[in-house]
């Protein structure tokens, strides 16, 4: 079974990340991904970068992935507002 930790490691291996959180039940996952690689990118392009990092795992193992993709500055603002 696919675990949140294994999804996290795959994302981190394929994308330079400052922070990654993944929760899920083995098929359905939620992720928060913070990366400088998202600077200047629209939400759709950010998600495409994460899908590319996941590669075949996204097609073969993950049924659904809900994600929040943030730059470090956006993450800091979100944490400060909380």
Indicate where each model-derived feature is located.
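Histidine-centered active-site/metal-ligand motif
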Residues: 28, 47, 63
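C-terminal structural segments of small proteins and small subunits
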Residues: 52-82
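Solvent-exposed beta-strand sheet faces enriched in polar/charged residues
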Residues: 23, 32-34, 68-70
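A short interface-forming secondary-structure element
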Residues: 32-45
